[in-house]
Design a protein with these regions (language model features):
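Helix-to-loop junctions at the C-terminal end of transmembrane segments
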Residues: 59-72, 155-156
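Paired small-residue
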Residues: 86, 97-105
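Short amphipathic helix-loop junctions that connect adjacent transmembrane helices
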Residues: 28-44
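A late C-terminal transmembrane helix in Major Facilitator Superfamily
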Residues: 127-158
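Structural signature of the two symmetry-related core transmembrane helices
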Residues: 74-89
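Intracellular juxtamembrane helix-capping segments at the cytosolic ends
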Residues: 112-125
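Pair of pore-lining "gating" transmembrane helices in MFS-fold secondary transporters
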Residues: 6-22, 104-108
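Small-residue hotspots at the loop-to-helix junctions and early N-terminal turns
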Residues: 42-50, 130, 134
Length: 187
């Protein structure tokens, strides 16, 4: 059952939307970026998403230890910074193979953002926990569904590189808003 998010749940849901927007955009557009912008052969088009996925999986599997060591606020800070830096590497690296490291950085940085946001859903007091989780989940899946279309719209109006730059800039919301998200350090 979907309930309109209230209070801090709106912020947490908006950040989850942004995180899943990036995941959806990479799922649908990374192969075109790898072949069109980085100059790889069509047969190698999937390498960017593969690197992103492996890095995200490794990050999620070690996420509990990362959160215990850094805390939720720092996970949001450094996760967002690492994703933005990954997009910068994708866009600015002088060679295609070096740019692929950007996909790894995006995967590692994004890996624990959404899990940290779900933890925040359990710490907030604006609405019942189950309804907060339902609202956040709905918002994040809207991001994964709308993300590819939004990237296509931006790419058509300008370029895929500009769309990827927009994604990197969007992920800077995590470090900027990290102290407003309920974590163990600030709840």
């Amino acid at each position: 059952m979907f309930t309109m998010p209230r209070g801090v749940v709106r912020l947490v849901g908006a950040l989850a939307f942004a995180a899943f927007l990036v995941e959806g955009a990479l799922l649908d557009w990374s192969a075109l970026f790898v072949t069109g912008s980085l100059g790889f052969a069509v047969a190698q088009g999937g390498i960017g998403y593969a690197l992103f996925s492996v890095a995200m999986t490794a990050g999620r599997l070690t996420g509990d230890q990362v959160v215990k060591r850094l805390g939720g606020v720092r996970v949001l800070l450094w996760g967002g910074v690492l994703v933005a830096a990954g997009f910068a590497l994708l866009l600015l690296a002088p060679a295609g193979w070096a740019a692929l490291g950007g996909f790894v950085a995006v995967g590692l940085g994004a890996a624990n953002l959404v899990p940290a946001l779900f933890s925040a859903a359990g710490r907030q007091r604006a609405m019942p926990e189950a309804l907060a989780v339902a609202s956040i989940t709905t918002m994040e899946y809207a991001g994964i569904l709308l993300g590819p279309a939004l990237i296509g719209f931006v790419a058509d109006a300008s370029s895929l590189r500009a769309a990827f730059a927009m994604l990197g800039a969007l992920m800077l919301l995590f470090p900027l808003l990290r102290n407003r998200v309920p974590t163990a350090e600030n709840a």
